[in-house]
Amino acid sequence: MGPAAGPSLLLLLLASVSLALGDPMYSIITPNILRLENEETVVLEAHEVQGDIPVTVTVHDFPAKKNVLSSEKTVLTSATGYLGTVTIKIPASKEFKSDKGRKLVVVQAAFGGTQLEKVVLVSLQSGYLFIQTDKTIYTPGSTVLYRIFTVDSDLLPVGRTIIVTIETPDGIPIKRDTLSSNNQHGILPLSWNIPELVNMGQWKIQAFYENSPKQVFSAEFEVKEYVLPSFEVLVEPTEKFYYIDDPKGLEVNIIARFLYGKNVDGTAFVIFGVQDGDQRISLAQSLTRVVIEDGSGEVVLSRQVLLDGVQPSRPEALVGKSLYVSVTVILHSGSDMVEAERSGIPIVTSPYQIHFTKTPKYFKPAMPFEIMVLVTNPDGSPAPHVPVVTQGSNVQSLTQADGVARLSINTPNTRQPLSVTVQTKKGGIPDARQAINTMQALPYTTMYNSNNYLHLSMPRTELKPGETINVNFHLRSDPNQEAKIRYYTYLIMNKGKLLKVGRQPREPGQALVVLPMPITKELIPSFRLVAYYTLIGASAQREVVADSVWADVRDSCVGTLVVKGGSGKDGQDKRQQHLPRQQMTLRIEGNQGARVGLVAVDKGVFVLNKKHKLTQSKIWDVVEKADIGCTPGSGKDYAGVFTDAGLSFKSSKAGLQTAQREGLDCPKPAARRRRSVQLMERRMDKAGKYKSKELRRCCEDGMRENPMQFSCQRRARYVSLGEACVKAFLDCCTYMAQLRQQHRREQNLGLARSDMDEDIIPEEDIISRSQFPESWLWTIEELKEPERNGISTKTMNIFLKDSITTWEILAVSLSDKKGICVADPFEVTVMQDFFIDLRLPYSVVRNEQVEIRAVLYNYREAQSLKVRVELLHNPAFCSLATAKKRHTQTVTIGPKSSVAVPYVLVPLKIGLQEVEVKAAVYNYFISDGVKKTLKVVPEGMRVNKTVAIRTLNPEQLGQGGVQREEIPAADLSDQVPDTDSETKILLQGTPVAQMAEDAVDAERLKHLIITPSGCGEQNMIGMTPTVIAVHYLDQTEQWEKFGLEKRQEALNLINRGYTQQLAFKQPNWAYAAFKNRASSTWLTAYVVKVFSLAANLIGIDSEVLCGAVKWLILEKQKPDGVFQEDGPVIHQEMIGGVRTAQEADVSLTAFVLIALQEAKDICRAQVNNLEANINKAGDYIESRYADVRRPYTLAIAGYALALLERLNGATLQKFLNAATEKNRWEEARQKLYSVEATSYALLALLLLKDFDAVPPVVRWLNEQRYYGRGYGSTQATFMVFQALAQYQTDVPDHKDLNMEVALQLPSRSSPSKFRLVWEAGSLLRSEATKQNEGFKLTAKGKGQGTLSVVAVYYAKTKRKVVCKNFDLRVTLKPAPDTVKKPQEAKSTMILGICTRYLGDQDATMSILDISMMTGFIPDTDDLKLLATGVDRYISKYEMNKDFSKNTLIIYLDKVSHSEEECLSFKIHQFFNVGLIQPGSVKVYSYYNLDETCTQFYHPEKEDGMLNKLCHKDLCRCAEENCFIQLPEKITLDERLEKACEPGVDYVYKTKLLKMELSDDFDEYIMTIEQVIKSGSDEVQAGKERRFISHIKCRDALHLKEGKHYLMWGLSSDLWGERPNMSYIIGKDTWVEAWPEAEECQDEENQQQCQDLGTFTENMVVFGCPN
């Protein structure tokens, strides 16, 4: 906690002294910032008085003092030592609502007939708002639950009106609500549904009290597409810094734990890098693969790798930069991956830093000086147990847990500044590397140079509530004055408020007085102690002597709040973990009457984002930031002590008072040093290392068989052990090319059909876990039970959700007496020793094959489990699970291990679809099931297409004040079929003042500050930009942005230009490029113009300026008013649009007139008839204006006339008509002239106060992005900034935005209406419709707005991009007969994988993630050979540590970008399964995890793709069995019964005309000869229809052209749109050959033919029975 970080508890000890009677003094003390709607204490004192003294305190408005805002009375008596307090409260009123200026009040205290008055600053902050969201991260389409806690400045609940907005990551508010917390006990529960189509990134909830709109409180949350991880990764360096001299390098520990507490086994990829500001340098050589065993791994960044990776590679060049380390951990099963990062590890020469932030800046000579040093690690965290010592005085101390050490030194009796140097004395670090820092303390200044001092001290740095400390008052005074000081007065101030006032007596001769002070929770988070005494000193004048000290109090809640499990007898839950769905008891302990907001959050949420949790320390940080005290104590004199402590003091003695406080913020607060190092996501890459082997090994490996059948020469390219090894390898390889080494493996895989004789739970008895919320328990509970030991307890029974995880139960309470409290999170771990973790991606694309993995965990200590696992059928997916056939496998899981079971799916339906996997253990009656939803999205790419953008300005663009717009429907010709589109209609107001602020950013003007030089013309070219830039920055108050110190530099340059220009002044006061050249009218007028503007900035001699004015009038103005040019300038480019010969007399006369008008105020007294001569020029311009044609001339002359108030009537109309599109005065192909002319026109419009015409002109000027530069830019630069500065000054804060907008959508019966108002001008209002339709808009009212219409839809992509930056080919061939296979293997195949990286250099450290087909396992001997031969093709391989090797991960050191990298190995089938599920191969680069490619493989399906039928863009699964094979004999009744089953849609007699056979599916074109039962397709007899079947059903169907068939099927088998519907022949289709007429003569067909005739007759006549 830092001294000035928040409303600290200001404990002010005011020491005051009773004096001999005779010189009464009255004083008033208030906080120097008073807060609206808050009770504030005012301290009143009287000295040397008798009798009772009535006091009235009133608070008035400032400066008028018309209203009494608060008034209180009290009486000071001898019984209270003439010390008293009153409580005042300033109500919120309209005076305090305006945005302009600081808010002040007058506090008056009338002590009898003596009146004191003090002006005090008012803060509109009347309390705090704390916002808690249920989570820190959300997916699109989910709901944000949030609570707003409304509290006053004492953190107690308050009922007030608040405004809440929700802002996009771009800072645009899209929702704004006005809400009241009255009758809500200070807790507002709210929610917001995130749209499906939403911007990803950091969103904000912002809230403020209606009466203090500047005090905005906010909470952030992230929106992204994510899936919760199953484990967390912590990256912990052994030191928080990297010490540059450390030869050991940087050691980092990696900890990986499942969310349910078990340790992770896997592989971590680690890369280090150097961060220098925003730039990151990745250290490629540091890329390492680390095995994570039992949850931990270690990695070291060596000093050499660090130095080799940077340029220049010198240690000192790295100091000041920082290191980061990125870690990605992948489970052995390949099913999940988590990234973590530790950044900001500083590279330092000293491991510590010393700060004096908590040390006062002033000392009292000859009294102890308390030095509080904060020692931090380089990352800013406190460094405990570090010895520190002062230089010179050699005082030693040790830092405490908070990093603070206290050193007390004796100061000399001198009034000179005191230099204090402190350094660390940590063992093992050379002196040169110890941290050292020096501060300078200044002496406290006494009044009248007396020797009266007061010094306060406390024993410790961080104080704990519940203890009592002694506050020491050390007195030093003139010996003959000491006896006058009889007592001290003290007061305690909390969070900017005065809490308590009292007195502490003092006996004569006591140099030290001790005040015992109990530290209560009310003093959290920090407080100040201020003391003062007063006396008539040796100078016979009244003196005040003061001191203060700041103290930190350990953070905790003021009240109590604890959440714990509560099933044991003592209220403690003894169980370490719980089962899913189990009931458990929660106990909440807190203050009676408190309301507790609860939420349970899956810990996985905080793995992804832990940044935005509400904690008690965050609450205190907010409170600290509002502290009105500003230093760690003391002050430069008595007034400085009060002011720095946040107090205002006024006495009845002249001059005895504090100065007026300048602003609400402290000049430089001593910040509370709290910092957490956050983990961020980072991607990285890895390059492998290889250790040398002897040549014999090279030869042996050369003789080994190569699975890829590469030639010896190609294999040798993979040998990286030097020339000698390559030579040996080639020699032996060539000699023994035919050598074969047979490898056998003896491992069995337990995948088989369910054994009926073993005990196992049937699938239908397993109830799947399906409730996996990321947060729940979002309730508010009231603690009503009577208190026991001051604490109330509530017991709740809750049912846990289905997730296997750890839940963090978070609680925030709000109590009327104890305020807000955030409890420590209570963790509840949920798991079982056998379970399924079904890992699903965030979303999948319809019709695109995907692999998911169900990971089965067995946490039993010693038992292997034989498990039957089943994927359940869902018609929304194509998989090996069909309506007719289950997809089960049997796997064995070893103790404390896991097995990943892959499933290949093709999603067929858009939306949220369920995937369900169940598993049962043989002989144990243990089972688990998981049902999760998978989001299926359309093919194609989501596109945001802008349909229309319109400016809304009914007064300007409408007719009769109403603007009508017709918006067309979007062109969605490229939309993916069977997908939705959404049209978003967005409305936003454009407040005019907002446009002004956005005019030109100060940052853009840096190039304008230049040094003028050259001749009389060049000097003015150089002087112009600086003068106009300073003028602009002054007017727009942007110097803070530009750099305050730069203003003086710019003024010096202007002065220089002015002085240089005087060298070119001719004896007649005119100017030319050189003294011997003819005087120039234009240049002289321009000097007048620039000097007139500069006269506000530097000292300009009026005689110089006005002499030039006289010359222009007397020498260059003709009788008719026109000015003539007899000495043209050399640099014609500098004169802008006046340069053109056309209408030059009018434009030159206007230019001179404008210059004279701008000099008028300075020269009116020195130049006779100046006004008359200006008017004469105006007469000339006015007489010529009707004939002028050039827009430039009309603009400059228009401004000249406006200056004389003569731009009106027909002249004004001509001026306005010259504007192109009402926003610019355009000169063809002359951008600079157009900018200059439009600037003159804007100045004219501002003089006319035509604020409606102004905005489009300003907008056009802003859109030009013209910041003044380049050849010929002098006039454009000068005028654009003069005009924009004038605009900033003139455009009043006229809040003219009040517009009603109505949208009439054809699909809606009534219009949607919106009102755009100033107060919420930037609020983005939106309307959305799923219909793609044109609509009409009407707008009426004042001001401007913008309408944007955007269509969001899925557009077809030009071609399918399945792979990103990788090419991948996978082949599967039967192994040759010569290959020996293990005895148990049913068959052996060779899996070939070839891949190439499509980037411009090799992809280092890439990964092949291979799912094996059901029943197959890889040949480990082949894999060993690939990994361990001297010709290494792979870096390493990993398989599940269990009996089912169904996931294989291969690590490659690189994937070439210039040629294919190929590998192949044998895979053996150890048992047969009915349907083999395809396997998959996925390649990805470690540097960029988004770069990936997946291909499938299968022994029968060439590309490993599941069978599906597609019609246009709609696909359906064809993996199910073909239609039912009919029994040989079927009766009439059976036929009728089957045809009348529910769902049968049609019954036809058909004739097959022709067959169209293809590689995927067959189409049969049939004639519908008779409609026996009509269905959804209203087909007539004689029409043709297509019947579609998958190729694999061709043989089973065996249809013949020209033959007749009886066919019926389900409505779900109809496809396409009327009138051209197609029919699927699937498992539910009836296909029966109908014998031809001649075939019916045969005896074997007679009965069938008769039955078919009767069947047809019954169906047609009677239909189906009900």
Swiss-Prot record:
Residues 1-22 form the signal peptide. GO terms for cellular component: extracellular space. The record marks 1666 as: Coordinates Mg(2+) for interaction with Complement factor B Bb fragment (CFB). SMART domains: A2M, A2M_N_2, A2M_recep, ANATO, C345C, Thiol-ester_cl. The modification Phosphoserine is found at residues 70, 296, 302, 676, 973, 1326, 1576. Complement activation is inhibited by VSIG4. There is a cross-link at residues 1015-1018 (Isoglutamyl cysteine thioester (Cys-Gln)). Keywords: Cleavage on pair of basic residues, Complement alternate pathway, Complement pathway, Disulfide bond, Glycoprotein, Immunity, Inflammatory response, Innate immunity, Phosphoprotein, Secreted, Signal, Thioester bond. Residues 698-733 form the Anaphylatoxin-like domain. Residues 1637-1662 are annotated as: Interaction with CFP/properdin. It comes from the Eukaryota. C3 precursor is first processed by the removal of 4 Arg residues, forming two chains, beta and alpha, linked by a disulfide bond. During activation of the complement systems, the alpha chain is cleaved into C3a and C3b by the C3 convertase: C3b stays linked to the beta chain, while C3a is released in the plasma. The alpha chain is cleaved by the serine protease complement C2b component of the C3 convertase to generate C3a and C3b following activation by the classical, lectin and GZMK complement systems. GO terms for biological process: complement activation, alternative pathway; complement activation, classical pathway; inflammatory response; positive regulation of D-glucose transmembrane transport; positive regulation of G protein-coupled receptor signaling pathway; positive regulation of lipid storage; positive regulation of protein phosphorylation; regulation of triglyceride biosynthetic process. Residues 1522-1664 form the NTR domain. InterPro entries: A-macroglobulin_rcpt-bd (IPR009048), A-macroglobulin_rcpt-bd_sf (IPR036595), A2M/Complement_sys (IPR050473), A2M_N_BRD (IPR011625), Alpha-macroglob_thiol-ester_cl (IPR047565), Alpha-macroglobulin_TED (IPR011626), Anaphylatoxin/fibulin (IPR000020), Anaphylatoxin_comp_syst (IPR018081). The keyword Iron does not apply. Glycans are attached at residues 944, 1620. GO terms for molecular function: C5L2 anaphylatoxin chemotactic receptor binding; endopeptidase inhibitor activity. The record marks 753-754, 964-965, 992-993, 1308-1309, 1325-1326 as: Cleavage. It is found in: Secreted. Disulfide bonds join 557-821, 630-666, 698-725, 699-732, 712-733, 878-1517, 1106-1163, 1363-1493, 1394-1462, 1510-1515, 1522-1593, 1540-1664, 1640-1649. Precursor of non-enzymatic components of the classical, alternative, lectin and GZMK complement pathways, which consist in a cascade of proteins that leads to phagocytosis and breakdown of pathogens and signaling that strengthens the adaptive immune system. PANTHER family: COMPLEMENT C3, MACROGLOBULIN / COMPLEMENT. In absence of complement activation, the C3 precursor is first processed by the removal of 4 Arg residues, forming two chains, beta and alpha, linked by a disulfide bond. This is Complement C3. It comes from Cavia porcellus (Guinea pig). The gene is C3.
